[in-house]
Design a protein with these regions (language model features):
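Generic detector of short, locally flexible boundary/turn motifs and exposed helical patches
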Residues: 16-18, 125-129
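Intrinsically disordered, low-complexity serine/proline/glycine/threonine-rich regulatory regions
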Residues: 69, 99, 124, 131-435
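Feature marks extracellular polysaccharide-active and adherence modules
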Residues: 2-4, 31-32, 39, 44-49, ...
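Acidic/polar low-complexity surface segments
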Residues: 1-31, 48-84, 91-109, 147-149, ...
Length: 435
């Protein structure tokens, strides 16, 4: 028997099983346009998702034949309303991600507000908002996710406020509990306000508030405030041994704005990794430390070259690590602490990379006037800084004590002191070296 493919204008939206980490089908509520209203619904028992904003750049199905949708882009459509909904007994709860497209998905022109979503008794993951411009208020996630598929993962900046995460509740009575992670630190940039964490402890083998993940762009502006805890003392899961972590994973950081994590205002929760910790840090919280530092991202670009070899990361206090970039990425990245002279950071590159003849280095996700000293080792003898506003310091000590935006050559190394300019969490600086 032969079958004929239906015409596009009458075809149904695909509804077979689609497997992905950030989104999977089928979905109980399969939402192809953001301009819809969902109030007081319950989704249960899906092998895929409870609610999936699976938006394409252009309309599909029977909408193709309707002239009023001809210029509509569902992916960028205005947001309708979403409140007082529940998901239980589903493999995933909620996603605004496009299947197999990385951190991409529904991006409304105005901030989408998801209010009072409750998720319980779920599978390996719960909530994935892939793009920014979204806020979750009174989000409740319990008995959902596992150690490596966290209850909440966001590749782009979103806000979570007045919310609750419970690792294993009374629903787990009878030895049905499991190791869990509340929030996976992906590219991130998530603003956490007044969030309560319950039972992230050693029960059932250990559950963690935060879990480190690799990221194409390690966003370090992850502020948290008003954090409260109940039976919780495992803050951080590295997911790997320090020697097996890439720079984007060891740089997964949460900034504690008000001290509610325990060390003080303006401190940070970081991986227990030699490139992140120092004498300001506390004892271990799981596999993390609280440190009296603020951290920014340093990005190093060799004229867009991809397939970069590993680079050696150093600190002047004797610590070092080998940084393996993500495959086919056109930059190195490193997360560094700012505004001190206890040590500086250094990088040693492969000779084949240096053959490119230029290096552009930027500091990102900083505060205004943040400074950091970087050393580039084994540089060609004719290497110099070609950036307007940078001046040459007399020596290394003068550079470190100076106001920033200076450089100096010392032997085979070039030292630079960057100084960020801009708004809080969005300040930047950039310096170009050529040879």
């Amino acid at each position: 028997m032969l079958t004929r493919r239906p015409r596009d204008e009458v075809a149904l939206i695909p509804s077979d099983i689609q497997d992905g980490e950030a989104a999977r089908g089928p979905s109980t509520f399969w939402i192809s346009n953001g301009d819809n209203t969902f109030i007081g619904n319950t989704a249960a028992g899906s092998d895929g998702l409870g609610f999936w904003y699976d938006t394409d750049e252009t309309v599909s199905g029977s909408s193709l034949s309707l002239s009023r949708y001809r210029n509509v882009s569902p992916m960028f459509s205005r947001f309708g309303e979403f409140r007082d909904n529940r998901v239980h007994s589903s493999d995933m709860a909620f996603s605004t991600c496009t299947l197999d497209s990385g951190p991409a998905g529904y991006l409304p022109p105005e901030r989408a507000q998801f209010h009072n979503l409750t998720v319980f008794a779920g599978g390996q993951g719960a909530v994935w908002p892939c793009e920014g411009n979204q806020i979750f208020t009174e989000l409740k996630v319990t008995d959902t996710g596992n150690l490596h598929h966290a209850g909440f993962v966001a590749p782009r900046p979103v806000t979570v406020r007045n919310s609750l995460f419970v690792a294993n509740s009374k629903l787990s009575d009878g030895d049905t509990g499991t190791r869990r992670s509340a929030i996976g630190i992906y590219d991130f940039g998530v603003d956490l306000r007044d969030v309560h964490f319950v039972n992230f402890n050693n029960e059932y083998g250990g559950s963690y508030m935060f879990g480190a993940r690799d990221a194409d762009v390690r966003i370090t502006n992850n502020p948290a405030s008003g954090i409260t805890l109940a039976d919780t003392y495992l803050y951080y899961d590295r997911r790997n041994d320090p020697e097996d972590m890439r720079p984007s994973a060891w740089g997964a950081v949460i900034h504690d704005e008000d001290g509610s994590l325990g060390l003080g205002a303006g401190t940070a929760l970081v991986a227990d990794h030699p490139m992140m910790t120092d004498s300001t840090c506390t004892d271990v919280f799981g596999e993390g430390r609280l440190c009296d530092n603020r951290y920014v991202r340093v990005k190093m670009d060799f004229d867009g070259r991809k397939d970069l070899p590993p680079v050696r990361h150093f600190r002047s206090d004797g610590r070092e690590a080998i940084g393996r970039p993500l495959a086919a990425r056109a930059h190195y990245q490193s997360v560094v602490s700012v505004n001190h002279n206890r040590y500086h950071y250094a990088y040693e590159f492969d000779a084949n990379v240096l053959a490119v003849g230029s290096l552009v280095t930027s500091m990102e996700f900083a505060h205004n006037d943040d400074t950091v000293v970087l050393e580039f080792r084994n540089m060609p003898s004719n290497a110099t800084v070609r950036t307007s506003g940078y001046s040459m310091a007399t020596n290394i000590d003068a550079l470190k004590q100076g106001p920033g935006r200076q450089f100096v050559r010392d032997g085979g190394s070039i030292f630079v002191k960057l100084k960020a300019n801009g708004e809080t969490w969005g300040a930047t600086d950039k310096v170009s070296l050529v040879w």
